A protein has these predicted regions:
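Hydrophobic, aromatic-enriched alpha-helical segments typical of multi-pass transmembrane helices
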Residues: 2-233
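Intrinsic disorder in cytosolic terminal tails and internal cytosolic loops
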Residues: 234-238
Length: 238
């Protein structure tokens, strides 16, 4: 692999970006103790200071470009690791490429939509509108975005995770088999299980499981890149 050192530095920056996105999600989706959920509505939204939502958007705007640096190096590493004559490898590499780029767009899009819904609810809560009217407005707003949000979530999580696991199982990515768990789909599922505990600090921790999954995947990819041979330049013969 050419520029191996640069690739590893970019992947490290990508991990930093994913960590910043985790902080953004904790700021906006860690609702704290005694939060009750009513459909899409969180009872603690009005209690949360507006600065948390504002910082959340700023963190995502800063973290996603850093994450993209790692994501594009991850795509390159997967492309170089596939077998040239394998159709399945080619398809999975293309799936990984597409879904990693979707994850970059999706982190901004999904975070922006969900934070906007929380802000709208918080602002309407301070008006004279009835509670039922507020819920109707907020849920109607969400359903306008539901299809693209759901599509980005499914493709960015499932596509990257399944294709990444494929390359580990078939030993194209040279990492331990435990890294099969290091992907956003598995972390998302683990987060949903944590939410079932109803223990508020576990529920709050689960808010950042998706970027945590991407962080772990980049870490596994970085280990793989470290094991890849350095491409040597061919000497020109006179």
């Amino acid at each position: 692999m050419k520029n191996k050192g640069k690739a590893m530095r970019n992947m490290l920056l990508g991990m930093l970006g994913a960590a910043v996105c985790m902080a953004a999600m904790w700021l906006s989706f860690a609702y704290g103790k005694d939060n009750d959920r009513n459909g899409l509505i969180m009872s603690n939204w009005p209690k949360m200071p507006m600065i948390r939502f504002e910082l959340s958007i700023i963190f995502v705007a800063f973290g996603v470009p850093l994450y993209y640096l790692g994501a594009k190096e991850m795509v390159k590493a997967i492309r170089l690791s596939r077998r040239r004559k394998s159709i399945n490898d080619l398809r999975m590499a293309r799936l990984f490429d597409m879904c990693m780029h979707l994850s970059v767009i999706g982190l901004v899009f999904i975070q922006g939509v969900l934070v906007a819904i929380a802000i709208v609810y918080k602002l309407l809560f301070g008006t004279k509108l009835m509670g039922a009217d507020i819920i109707y407005v907020v849920e109607s707003l969400f359903y306008y975005f539901a299809i693209p949000v759901f599509a980005y979530l499914v493709f960015s999580l499932a596509g990257t995770s399944i294709s990444f696991m494929y390359f580990i199982i078939n030993e194209r990515v040279k990492v331990s088999k435990i890294c099969l768990l290091f992907n956003p789909l598995v972390m998302f599922g683990l987060g949903e299980l944590l939410k079932l505990t109803k223990i508020y600090y576990l529920v709050d921790f689960a808010a950042a499981m998706i970027p945590f999954g991407f962080l772990l995947m980049l870490a596994a990819g970085m280990v793989h890149v470290a094991k890849m041979p350095v491409a040597r330049r061919r000497r020109r013969t006179e």
